[in-house]
């Protein structure tokens, strides 16, 4: 299991907001964010290619688009704070960038939870060369 963690760290990097995003995913889905989502479909984890395979993969596509809109905010490395109120994720508001990054992650974590019933194990470790089609625009 330790080797899997080391590989996952190399693949997705555990820095900045990725730590908070991982916690959100774990809290919302009760799934391990690294083993369940880092290589899922065509849009989760590093790189984005082709059409989303299903609703969960679409969550990742939308999340990537959200981050793209915030590229000046360094969304993968800029850490933020959040808390929960009555089970709901509430993003802190220390700066505009941190709040917006948190909101992107919040929306994706909720999207994953809302699509748990259609999570497809065959896409859990999906090889990107299988991803075909013209990618949608954000």
Curated annotation (Swiss-Prot):
MF (Gene Ontology): acetylcholine receptor inhibitor activity; calcium ion binding; calcium-dependent phospholipase A2 activity; phospholipid binding; toxin activity
Main location: secreted
Record keyword Disulfide bond present: yes
Family matches, as SUPFAM superfamilies: Phospholipase A2, PLA2 (SSF48619)
Residue span of region Important for membrane-damaging activities in eukaryotes and bacteria: 121-133
Keywords: Acetylcholine receptor inhibiting toxin, Disulfide bond, Neurotoxin, Postsynaptic neurotoxin, Secreted, Signal, Toxin
Domain of life of the native organism: Eukaryota
Expressing tissues: Expressed by the venom gland.
Secretion signal, residue range per the UniProt entry: 1-16
Subcellular location: Secreted
Disulfide-bond pairs as recorded: 42-131, 44-60, 59-111, 65-138, 66-104, 73-97, 91-102
GO biological process, one term: negative regulation of T cell proliferation
GO CC annotation: extracellular region
One Pfam family matching this protein: Phospholip_A2_1
Annotated function: Snake venom phospholipase A2 homolog that lacks enzymatic activity. Is able to suppress the acetylcholine (ACh)-evoked current mediated by alpha-7 (CHRNA7)-similar nAChRs in L.stagnalis neurons (IC(50)=2.18 uM). This activity is only partially reversible and seems to be non-competitive.
Protein family (similarity comment): Belongs to the phospholipase A2 family. Group II subfamily. S49 sub-subfamily.
Protein name: Basic phospholipase A2 homolog Vur-S49
């Amino acid at each position: 299991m330790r080797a899997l963690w080391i590989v996952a760290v190399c693949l997705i990097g555990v820095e900045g907001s990725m730590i908070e995003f991982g916690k959100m995913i774990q809290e919302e889905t009760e799934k391990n964010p690294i083993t369940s989502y880092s290589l899922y479909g065509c849009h989760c984890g590093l790189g984005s290619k082709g059409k989303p395979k299903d609703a969960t993969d679409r969550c990742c596509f939308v999340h990537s688009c959200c981050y793209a809109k915030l590229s000046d905010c360094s969304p993968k490395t800029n850490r933020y704070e959040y808390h929960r109120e009555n089970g709901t994720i509430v993003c802190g508001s220390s700066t505009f960038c941190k709040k917006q990054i948190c909101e992107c992650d919040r929306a994706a974590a909720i999207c994953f939870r809302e699509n748990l019933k259609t999570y497809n194990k065959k896409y859990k470790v999906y090889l990107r060369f299988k991803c075909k089609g013209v990618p949608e625009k954000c």
